[in-house]
C-alpha cells in the first residue's frame, strides 16, 4: 500500500503518520487549516503570549509515547504535579470536592456525610441506567445534586440523566468513607487526582510536541475534504483539487465525515447526525501579574457564573507569557443539540472578565494586557443515551467502505492526547493489516 492518506494533523493524525513511517511508508496528510495541530493547536501572539486550543498537557503512563514526545522537544519540557481547585457559591474547595468538604456549610456537610455512610453500608447495588443514577449510587443524593450534577449541565450542556456511563473511567474519584470524614473535619487532605504528574513543552505551546513529525509526511494544508469516493478511492477537496489513495485514515468528526462519503445510506447519515459534541468558546486573557490562581485547572459549579472551567497557561510554562505576567484560559460550553451558541465569540470576553472579578480571580486594579476569543466547533463528545447505538452504526459503515477512523472524533471517544496518538497508530496498523 503506497498511497496512504491521513485526514487531520492533530495527535491522532500524527499517530497514524508515525505508524506509517515506522512501516516504511510516507503518508500524505491533509488539513483544512493553515497550520498543523488539530485540537492540540497552539497559537503564539504578539507580545509574548502563547495559548493552546484548550488546556492540554501530557500525562501519559505509556513510556513509549512519553519518550517519543520528550525527544520531539529535545527534553525541554516542564514537569509538574497537577493542582486543581473548585469554586462553589463563594467557597474555594480543593479538588476533588468529595474529600475536601471542610469549611462548607455545616448543614450541607452533615447531609453529605450521612449519605456517604448510607452508600458505604448499602448491601444491594442499585440499578444504574444513566450517569445520574451512577452519581447518586456513588456519592449519595446531596453531593451528587450539589456538585457533579450541576457541573454536568455546564460542561456537557445536558443533564446527568441524559448521559450514559461509558466515558467515566478514572475521572471521578470514589473515596473511602474515612477519606470523606477526614476531609470534612480537617482543612488539609491528601492530594488526589487521576493525573499524578504532567509534562508540557518549555516553548511553543503543546503543539511543539508535534512539530518534528512534519518531516515524516507530506503535509498539505488548506485542503478541506468535501467528498470521498470510496469505490474509486479518490478524495475531493474544497479548493477544487482531488487525490487518489490506496488507504485512508480519518480523524474528522463523524458528523462531518459521513455526509462526505458517496452513497452513505440514510440510516447511517441519521445516526451520524444524532452524535452530540460540545463546542466551546475559549477566552484567553493576559494579566499584568502572575499570582492569579494557584491551580492549573479550576472548576466552577454555579450556573450563574458565565464559564465552566479556567486554566492557567503560565503555570504550565512560564514562557507562555511575558516576564512578570500571568494568563487565564476560560472555557464557555455550548452544543448545537442542547445549548446552541447564541453570541459571537468576542461577545463572551466582557462577561468572562466580569465574573472573574466577581469570583475574586481578577482584581479591579488588574490590567488585562491581552484578550482573545475563539470558537472551537468540536470540544468534548457528549455521551448521551443515543451515542452508543449511533456510533456503532457509523463505525460499521466506515469499516464496510474501508475508511479508517481515529482520535477523539473518529473513535467518538472521551480520550486524551496520548490515547489519541495511539488510536491513530492502531488505525494505521489495521489499515495495513487489511491491505
Model-predicted segments: where are they?
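Mid-domain catalytic core of redox enzymes
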Residues: 23, 224-329, 333-342, 346-347, ...
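Conserved Rossmann-like nucleotide-cofactor binding loop
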Residues: 12, 35, 255
Amino acid at each position: 500500500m503506497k498511497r496512504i492518506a491521513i485526514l487531520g494533523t492533530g495527535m491522532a493524525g500524527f499517530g497514524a503518520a508515525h505508524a506509517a513511517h515506522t512501516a516504511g511508508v510516507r503518508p500524505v496528510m491533509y488539513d483544512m487549516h493553515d497550520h498543523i495541530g488539530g485540537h492540540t493547536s497552539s497559537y503564539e501572539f504578539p507580545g509574548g503570549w502563547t495559548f493552546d486550543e484548550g488546556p492540554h498537557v501530557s500525562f501519559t503512563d505509556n513510556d513509549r509515547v512519553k519518550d517519543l514526545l520528550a525527544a520531539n522537544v529535545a527534553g525541554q519540557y516542564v514537569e509538574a504535579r497537577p493542582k486543581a481547585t473548585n469554586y462553589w457559591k463563594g467557597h474555594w474547595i480543593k479538588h476533588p470536592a468529595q474529600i475536601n468538604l471542610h469549611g462548607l456549610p455545616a448543614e450541607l456537610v452533615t447531609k453529605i456525610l450521612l449519605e456517604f455512610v448510607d452508600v458505604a453500608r448499602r448491601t444491594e447495588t442499585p440499578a444504574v441506567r444513566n450517569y445520574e443514577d451512577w452519581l447518586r449510587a456513588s456519592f449519595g443524593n446531596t453531593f451528587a445534586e450539589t456538585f457533579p450534577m450541576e457541573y454536568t449541565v455546564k460542561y456537557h450542556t445536558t443533564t446527568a440523566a441524559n448521559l450514559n456511563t461509558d466515558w467515566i473511567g478514572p475521572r471521578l474519584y470514589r473515596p473511602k468513607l474515612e477519606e470523606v470524614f477526614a476531609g470534612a473535619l480537617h482543612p488539609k487532605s491528601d492530594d488526589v487526582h487521576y493525573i499524578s504528574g504532567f509534562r508540557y513543552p518549555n516553548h511553543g505551546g503543546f503543539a511543539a510536541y508535534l512539530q518534528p513529525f512534519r518531516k515524516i509526511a507530506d503535509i498539505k494544508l488548506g485542503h478541506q475534504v468535501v467528498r470521498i469516493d470510496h469505490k474509486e478511492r479518490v478524495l475531493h477537496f474544497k479548493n477544487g483539487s482531488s487525490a487518489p489513495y490506496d488507504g485512508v485514515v480519518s480523524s474528522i468528526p463523524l458528523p462531518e465525515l459521513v455526509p462526505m462519503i458517496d452513497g452513505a445510506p440514510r440510516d447511517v447519515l441519521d445516526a451520524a447526525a444524532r452524535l452530540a459534541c460540545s463546542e466551546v468558546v475559549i477566552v484567553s486573557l493576559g494579566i499584568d501579574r502572575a499570582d492569579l490562581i494557584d491551580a492549573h485547572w479550576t472548576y466552577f459549579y454555579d450556573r450563574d457564573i458565565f464559564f465552566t472551567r479556567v486554566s492557567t497557561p503560565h503555570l504550565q510554562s512560564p514562557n507562555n507569557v511575558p516576564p512578570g505576567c500571568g494568563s487565564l484560559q476560560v472555557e464557555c460550553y455550548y452544543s448545537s443539540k442542547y445549548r446552541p451558541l447564541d453570541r459571537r465569540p468576542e461577545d463572551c470576553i466582557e462577561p468572562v472578565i466580569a465574573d472573574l472579578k466577581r469570583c475574586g480571580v481578577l482584581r479591579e486594579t488588574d490590567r488585562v494586557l491581552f484578550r482573545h476569543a475563539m470558537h472551537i466547533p468540536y470540544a468534548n463528545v457528549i455521551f448521551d443515551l443515543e451515542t452508543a447505538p449511533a456510533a456503532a452504526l457509523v463505525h460499521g459503515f466506515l469499516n464496510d467502505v474501508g475508511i479508517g477512523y481515529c482520535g477523539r472524533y473518529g473513535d467518538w471517544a472521551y480520550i486524551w492526547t496520548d490515547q489519541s496518538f495511539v488510536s491513530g497508530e492502531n488505525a494505521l496498523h489495521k489499515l495495513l493489516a487489511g491491505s
